[in-house]
């Protein structure tokens, strides 16, 4: 449940934070994100309008249509999600055919982006600075965002004014040192009231004293200027536990997306009797990737194995899909993929069981042998012997 106070608080937090480095002059920004999502609703539709900025609204993200809108209108600020940024970096020839010199800032939220993707984007738009942010519906939008005056690769920036933050370990104790991961817990006037008609979920997320458990594993690191930055490692619940060792899906995804044959990727855990869980990758092939699936599967496995420790290898498999399930804001729906993995595994188990049950035992001269199997029909000579 989001109150008017929550929404107003986050708008004021955004505008106050941006006033430390942004000109008072209104600017034109890109409105390609779905406004039904909290990120676009608060940042684009509310905070930008409150500042007096103009918003060029598009019905959805289509690469060339978006680039044309930027060129035609002289858009200065891009509000994006990572899949859009990746799409731009994967089409350098198309991007270079448009005049994007007006763009000075690309603000990216919803999930992380790799250093290599940022570098490629920087080569295509050298005058544009990328800043990353972090937020969630439960905070009515944004918690922190990068600052062009003090940036760090991979950082989600600094906490917005009005936020209090703590990191806690698995036992609920405070993490008090830099560069040490812990679950982020927050307190702010923008933190929501709770979940509608769901006291159980509300009590699970809300701690005593008005603190919200985000479920995100975070580190606090200091920049060379001495400012503290928020680094999101991964979702606590999405960490894959392989033989007691933790694997962050985002780490594998940020590496796999750099392969030229990969357009999109999501890594999830699949159960394993020996290891507990194993990483599995769902991949959308890039257009023009013509390798046979088996060949590409082997190549991608080796691509990971050459970079990561043994427990991070894709021993759960690689599966190719036409598309990956995402929310309207572009965030990957891992729950849907996990359910698909469970359903597929159950279907394979039932198929094996059905095949086994299709083998009937009969006695022939005191010796048991198969009479019929689902896959193979026994010869008529064998049937005559019966």
Curated annotation (Swiss-Prot):
Binding site for CoA: 243-245, 313-316
Induction of expression: Expression is positively regulated by the leucinostatins biosynthesis cluster-specific transcription regulator lcsF.
SBD2: annotated segments: 133-195
Region (SBD1), start-end ranges: 62-132
GO molecular function terms noted in the UniProt entry: ATP binding; CoA-ligase activity
Chain residues that bind ATP: 107-115, 216, 235, 331
InterPro entries found in the cross-reference section: AMP-bd_C, AMP-bd_C_sf, AMP-dep_synth/lig_dom, ANL_N_sf
Domain of life assignment: Eukaryota
A Pfam cross-reference name: AMP-binding
Stretches the record annotates as Disordered: 352-386
Knockout or disruption consequences: Abolishes the production of leucinostatins A and B.
Keywords (A to Z) from UniProt: ATP-binding, Ligase, Nucleotide-binding
Annotated substrate binding sites: 137
EC numbers for this chain: 6.2.1.-
Record pathway: Secondary metabolite biosynthesis
Keyword Nucleotide-binding: yes
Described function: Acyl-CoA ligase; part of the gene cluster that mediates the biosynthesis of the lipopeptide antibiotics leucinostatins that show extensive biological activities, including antimalarial, antiviral, antibacterial, antifungal, and antitumor activities, as well as phytotoxic.
Recorded family membership: Belongs to the ATP-dependent AMP-binding enzyme family.
Domain notes from UniProt: Both substrate-binding domains (SBD1 and SBD2) are involved in the substrate recognition, and are sufficient to confer the substrate specificity.
Name recorded for this polypeptide: Acyl-CoA ligase lcsD
Source organism per UniProt: Purpureocillium lilacinum
